């Protein structure tokens, strides 16, 4: 599926809110930068507990007439590193946000093959955020388990295995 319709055409009278999530190393930050380049306001690493406050503020602006569908769309990066993260809690929050008038909430999930993620972590000499004292493969397995419900409700799943981060644009 192509991401183009999801990125460029908000429904009438709705402000577009893209939630970008997925596995560490799959390119979330690069995707947010690319979205910023095409006019999105980008927020990265938003703690899950702050999501309703940020999006609720956008909805309040729209309700008061200060913002409309022509306003700058926003892309929000959220991953499982947030304190107290729960995939089920994330899914429940998204379901609730999707009922918010004047907002079009779309979830994009970035995925990647384990071998490619391991190579990316090795090349950058970074540890996996969920396995600071264990191997990268352990962190990836733990993260896949945590993110399983999120991936299942995504409007679009993008596999970045064959794409260098620079190609996410």
Label for each model-derived stretch:
Residues 84-87, 114-121, 129, 147, ...:
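Switch/connector loops and helix/strand junctions flanking conserved nucleotide-binding motifs
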């Amino acid at each position: 599926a192509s991401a183009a319709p999801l990125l460029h055409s908000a429904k009438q009278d709705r402000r577009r809110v893209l939630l970008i999530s997925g596995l560490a190393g799959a390119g979330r930050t690069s995707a947010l930068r690319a979205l910023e380049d095409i006019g999105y306001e980008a927020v990265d690493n938003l703690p899950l507990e702050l999501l309703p406050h940020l999006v609720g503020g956008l909805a309040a602006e729209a309700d008061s007439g200060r913002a409309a569908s022509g306003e700058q769309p926003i892309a929000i990066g959220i991953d499982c590193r947030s304190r107290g993260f729960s995939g089920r809690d994330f899914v429940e929050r998204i379901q609730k946000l999707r009922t918010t008038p004047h907002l079009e909430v779309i979830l994009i999930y970035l995925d990647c093959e384990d071998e490619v993620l391991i190579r990316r972590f090795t090349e950058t000499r970074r540890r996996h955020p969920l396995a600071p004292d264990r191997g990268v493969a352990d962190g990836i397995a733990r993260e896949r388990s945590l993110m399983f419900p999120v991936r299942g409700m995504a409007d679009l799943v993008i596999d970045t295995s064959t794409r260098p981060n620079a190609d996410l644009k």
